[in-house]
A protein has these predicted regions:
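Alpha-helical promoter-recognition and RNA polymerase-docking modules of transcription initiation factors
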Residues: 4-127
């Protein structure tokens, strides 16, 4: 009876902690917030750049899961590496995006993220 009680209490604690953490990534910015960040970045605001990057980390994980499922099935280390490399592409996108050209940031960022991952994978294959 005590072990059953311990089991129930442990699971309640786990559920409580899980609900408290909600998400490992910040919520995505609204279109207005995103545009405001992009305008501030164009004016040289480093804090706006960091906010834009942090709020698009979930997008990097989505692209890795969608475009590189073989790496996700391989090991968590492979997935973490691809997300890290994809984040470098996201940083590049945040620094070079031009809103006046009419495209959405997510469209531009997806290409930058994918290019960073593809470039790194080609570089690794050269040394194998």
């Amino acid at each position: 009876m005590i072990t059953l009680l311990e089991f129930v209490l442990q699971n309640l604690l786990f559920i409580g902690l899980h609900l408290d953490c909600r998400s490992s990534f910040p919520k995505q910015l609204s279109k207005a917030e995103e545009r405001e960040c992009i305008e501030k970045i164009a004016a040289g605001d480093a804090e706006a750049r960091n906010v834009l990057i942090e709020h698009n980390l979930r997008f990097v994980a989505y692209i890795v899961n969608k475009n590189y499922p073989e790496s996700i099935r391989g090991s968590q280390q492979d997935a973490d590496d691809l997300i890290s490399i994809g984040t470098i592409g996201l940083i590049r996108a945040a620094e070079t995006f031009d809103y006046s050209k009419g495209s959405h940031f997510s469209t531009y960022a997806s290409r930058c993220i994918d290019n960073a991952i593809t470039h790194q994978r080609k570089h690794i294959r050269q040394f194998q």
